[in-house]
């Protein structure tokens, strides 16, 4: 069996420099300055917010926010963050990784003690601004027009196509199922789906918000996070919730004592009230379940050869952990951009049968 895991490098190869991190951030700022953004979905203040966060970048590098880290994954993320930047120099707003802005966001909000719903709403606006910049007014969905016949043929030679990209260029060019590990611009998030399990509950989780279908990509399943553990959590939470709910309902229906306990739960607590309502609703409508929108299990199931192209060995560690744990992957072919990436890949996959290849040679061959 042959599988391939594809990252943003493939979009950059065919779509150009506009999909580099710096240009995505610049486009986000330019969209706001030109008033060519959906202001009702993310306000113009988002641009000021980016610059305010960027001003704290140096402070975060030099330990100022160390005491405002309250979770293990945030601490790990901050350590990694410090390793990726030079603490002796200043970085412009476009030199900071756009996902790192979300770490800075959390650190500052921790320091200021800002909580939900203000924190949630601000994070959501920041996410929409960056996703809109990646989407590039839909231009990203046309990148496949630059794919060569040879590249498409190579893609089709694989049994499984997996990607961390949000766009549908691989889907369109091959006509095959593509597994979007971090979500897709074209898939509505369960949060905004009126037919989803969570939106059948009495409480209005969306607080009356209506989806603007002129901008479906801003309501999509795309994962944007500064830490792989949070992406991994988002990828697995639906399956875990379904498993837990099945156990609750089974106990509720088969154990009279547990049924009495659940029926007597104090509904003055919103979380308890929602859980109780969900159990009763699931018991009455067993077909209801949380949609599993991320194919997170696939990396544990594939076998044979896995080729990796367009990804850095220093990002998406949560995915590489699944690959390392999968004993049925007998060979990894890592396409690198330069000697440093090759060395990093060899260190990362030292326990695997690994071969490396310069991605520039790959493109010369496949496009010939």
Specify the residue positions occupied by each region the protein language model found.
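SIR2/sirtuin-family catalytic core signature
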Residues: 1-17, 23, 27-28, 35-38, ...
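Surface-exposed cleft-lining segments at the edges of enzyme active sites
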Residues: 133-143, 279-285
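C-terminal or late-domain output modules
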Residues: 7, 89, 109, 113, ...
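PAPS-dependent sulfotransferase catalytic core
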Residues: 16-19, 24, 30, 53-61
């Amino acid at each position: 069996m042959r599988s391939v895991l594809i990252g943003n490098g493939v979009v950059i190869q065919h779509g150009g420099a506009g999909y580099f991190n710096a240009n995505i951030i610049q486009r986000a700022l330019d969209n706001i300055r030109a008033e060519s953004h959906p202001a009702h979905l993310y306000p113009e203040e988002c641009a000021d917010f980016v610059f305010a966060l960027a001003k704290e970048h140096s402070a975060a590098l030099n330990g100022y926010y160390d005491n405002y880290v309250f979770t293990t994954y945030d601490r790990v993320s901050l350590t990694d963050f410090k390793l990726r930047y030079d603490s002796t120099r200043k970085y412009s707003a476009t030199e900071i990784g756009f996902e790192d802005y979300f770490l800075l966001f959390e650190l500052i909000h921790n320091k200021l003690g800002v909580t939900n719903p203000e924190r949630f709403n601000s994070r959501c606006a920041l996410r929409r601004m960056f996703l809109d910049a990646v989407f590039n007014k839909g231009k990203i969905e046309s990148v496949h027009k630059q794919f060569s016949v040879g590249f498409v043929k190579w893609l089709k030679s694989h049994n499984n196509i997996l990607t961390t990209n949000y766009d549908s260029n691989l889907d369109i060019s091959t006509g095959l199922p593509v597994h979007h590990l971090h979500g897709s611009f074209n898939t509505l998030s369960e949060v905004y789906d009126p037919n989803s399990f969570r939106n059948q509950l009495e409480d209005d989780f969306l607080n009356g918000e209506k989806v603007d279908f002129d901008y479906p990509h801003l309501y999509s399943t795309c994962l944007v996070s500064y830490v792989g553990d949070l992406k991994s959590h988002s990828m697995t939470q639906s399956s875990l919730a379904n498993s837990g709910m099945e156990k609750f309902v089974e106990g509720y229906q088969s154990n009279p004592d547990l049924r009495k306990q659940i029926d007597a739960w104090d509904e003055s607590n919103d979380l308890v009230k929602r859980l109780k309502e969900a159990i009763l609703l699931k018991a009455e409508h067993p077909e209801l379940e949380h949609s599993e929108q991320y194919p997170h299990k696939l990396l544990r199931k594939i076998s044979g050869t896995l080729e990796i192209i367009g990804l850095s060995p220093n990002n998406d560690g949560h995915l590489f952990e699944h690959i390392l744990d999968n004993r049925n992957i007998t060979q990894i072919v890592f396409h690198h951009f330069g000697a440093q990436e090759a060395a990093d890949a060899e260190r990362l996959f030292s326990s695997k049968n690994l071969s490396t290849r310069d991605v520039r040679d790959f493109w010369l061959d496949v496009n010939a």
